[in-house]
């Protein structure tokens, strides 16, 4: 599977490639021609192992939920396992993000999650704003 929708952001000193179709991840970051994040080839991405490269939002939870289960308000919730037997790094990194705005040096993207998808009981919406300014992100 290849992901063709790559957003390229650029300043005189910074270059950033964003993959909205692949979890809104930063696939490449270059500063003064030095690779901060080495890009990976989108043709070899395994969708359920996309946490193994680049930088992405850990939404709605970070790290691991042991045995993919948690309790809240005396109810037990079972999440989809994406690192068996655990759930890891949320699920926004697995979803397609939509581009709301783009300039040469910035982008705003959004991910909308439906309740109960991947076992997560609540719907949510999350935004990323990425802006390059000279030597800052």
List each language-model region with its residue ranges.
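Surface-exposed acidic/polar loop and edge beta-strand patches at domain peripheries
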Residues: 1-136
């Amino acid at each position: 599977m290849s992901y063709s929708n790559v957003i390229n952001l650029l300043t005189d000193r910074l270059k950033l490639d964003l993959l909205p179709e692949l979890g809104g991840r930063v696939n490449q970051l270059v500063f003064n021609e030095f690779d901060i994040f080495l890009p990976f080839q989108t043709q070899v991405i395994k969708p359920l192992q996309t946490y193994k490269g680049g930088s992405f939002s850990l939404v709605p939870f970070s790290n691991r939920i042991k045995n993919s289960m948690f309790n809240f308000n005396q109810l037990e919730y079972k999440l989809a396992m994406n690192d068996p037997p655990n759930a890891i790094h949320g699920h926004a990194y697995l979803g397609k993000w939509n581009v709301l705005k783009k300039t040469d040096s910035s982008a705003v993207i959004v991910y909308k999650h439906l309740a109960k998808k991947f076992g997560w009981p609540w719907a949510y919406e999350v935004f990323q704003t990425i802006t390059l300014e000279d030597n800052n992100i």
